A protein has these predicted regions:
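Catalytic-domain carbohydrate-binding cleft regions of carbohydrate-active enzymes
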Residues: 1-324
């Protein structure tokens, strides 16, 4: 996002999604670069940082309010299927731990590669690892505990949803007209083309609503958004992927937001994201700092989480969290 906040109590924002960078090394001036002509450059000032942030978020958008349940206990991250994941909840409660949610990112199944276990990128509950998941979610709800899963904007090319999406023509193309497949490490995935209204609505309605919200899921990691390829990928709207790349996280956030809002569950459901761009603030219920090292190292440990929280908060994503 091409925005910075100055210690002199002003912010500057460039209206562009092209590649850009800011150079603050010279004490007398700032050097701004972007690979197109921005629509405008916006500067606003205020007496205090609080007032300045009010102005900036009024311009960029503000995050939806979080539901009360997210503050009422631990959200446990567990994997391995029904017995193990729900068993950890039971043990936690037995030991007096207050639990508000269970996050099972492998609710969709696992995929074994030569370098470890990955998820099965086919966004519906895995009937072998999580049989009768909707029933188990109901049982959690009866105990006042929420269930969270995982979704990202790609579909693995040997999955059920990819086959359905291919019939509907929802994937971004290569220059030769074939589906653009991304290599994610021993498996390939189609890129759902959110610039195509039919593809956008299909993913929103037939994937997020049908396979997550409709079975009672209360939240999910809405992962990725930052990986749009920029070589020979062709989008439905005709815009170069070099320009659309930094806008992609906004489209991904909006797709999740629209699914939740249209289902009447805004303020009840929480999805957390690791990517963002100009305008994603109003569509992102919670920002996630990414995969840090569980240590105090300078470049990827606890201190980086603090920097990320402060920086994201200063550009309108004050609701954020990190893994423990």
């Amino acid at each position: 996002q091409p925005t910075y906040v100055s210690s002199r109590h002003y912010y500057l924002h460039m209206d562009t999604t092209a590649y850009g960078d800011f150079d603050f090394r010279n004490p007398r001036y700032h050097e701004l670069q972007c690979w197109n002509v921005p629509g405008f450059i916006r500067i606003e000032a205020a007496p205090t940082f609080v007032e300045l942030l009010e102005k900036l978020t009024a311009f960029l958008g503000r995050q939806p309010e979080l539901p009360e349940w997210i503050y009422n206990g631990l959200i446990i991250g567990a994997q391995g299927g029904n017995e193990r994941s729900f068993g950890i909840v039971d043990k936690s409660l037995e030991h007096g731990i207050k639990v508000s949610g269970l996050w099972c990112q492998d609710w969709c199944g696992k995929r074994v590669t030569s370098f470890g276990k990955r998820l099965q990128w086919d966004w519906h509950f895995h009937k072998e690892m999580y049989p009768d998941l909707p029933k188990h979610i109901e049982e959690l709800h009866a105990r006042g505990i929420k269930f969270l899963g995982y979704v990202n904007p790609y579909l693995v090319n040997d999955g059920e949803l990819y086959a359905e999406g291919k019939k509907r023509g929802v994937f971004a193309k290569k220059a030769d007209g074939s589906d653009y497949l991304v290599d994610f490490g021993e498996f390939y995935c189609g890129v759902v083309d959110f610039t195509n209204p039919e593809a956008y609505n299909w993913f929103k309605d037939e994937v997020i609503k049908k396979y997550t919200l409709d079975i009672g899921i209360d939240g999910w990691m809405a992962d990725f958004g930052e990986y749009l390829p920029t070589d020979d990928l062709v989008l439905a709207n005709g815009v170069s992927p070099m320009i659309e790349h930094n806008h992609w996280p906004v489209l991904w956030a909006k797709c999740n937001y629209d699914a939740v809002k249209e289902s009447g569950k805004l303020g009840q459901v929480v999805y957390f994201m690791r990517a963002g761009g100009t305008g994603s603030q109003k569509y992102c219920t919670l920002l996630w700092a990414g995969d840090q090292s569980v240590d105090f190292s300078r470049h990827d440990g606890l201190c980086t989480v603090i920097c990320a929280a402060l920086s994201s908060g200063m550009v309108g994503c004050g609701l954020n969290h990190c893994d423990i």
